[in-house]
Amino acid sequence: VKQLIIPFSLQKSGMNSSNSLISYGIVNGMAMPIIMFPVSLIVSFSSLLVPEFSRCYAQSKYSKIKIISVIVLVCTLLFSLIVSIIIFIFSDKLSIWIYHKAEIAKYLRILSPLIVIMYLDIVIDSILKGLDAQVDVMVVNIFDCLISIAFIYFLVPILGFSGYIISIFISEIINFSLSGYKLLGILKRLKNK
């Protein structure tokens, strides 16, 4: 649904259909794959966390859960900061080297701060799944999708393509904040056990 609303909303902002699809394609088809490519390491790593957290949770090893959570989140934070800085600094070279188009660099620089939030959110979701909070992860993701659709529907016609970029930021920040809040709540609850 979201992918159908974006070009429609961009056209309502005054962009013609070809320009709206080109802009959307540059961000989702070119910039986002570069930003998300390093996340394959995080996804592989975080998928290994789910059974480990489940085992610790089932065995009531709550202090181990906290220690592993801190280590994993700090490592993810450091990795995502490095990736974010590299993509920001080398955005021109990456866009020319990969796509032979300099205009993609602008979107890489704009979206690079989101790397930290997106990568941490992936790890937090894996930790939550391991702590038997899969339903909470699903609820947050559904809420995030609905918020994203609302922002795209209402913001993009007013602000144009900038509204789409803003909606990406807001959506990712909301998802990260809700997931992080849920994880903190679970870790505090485990602290009392």
Q: Which residue ranges define each predicted feature?
A:
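Junctions where cytoplasmic loops transition into the N-terminal start of transmembrane alpha-helices
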Residues: 24-31, 67-80
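Membrane-interface junctions at transmembrane-helix termini in multi-pass inner-membrane proteins
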Residues: 115-140
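Short membrane-interface helical motifs at transmembrane helix boundaries
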Residues: 82-100
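Helix-terminus/linker motif at the lipid-water interface of multi-pass membrane proteins
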Residues: 1-37, 95-97
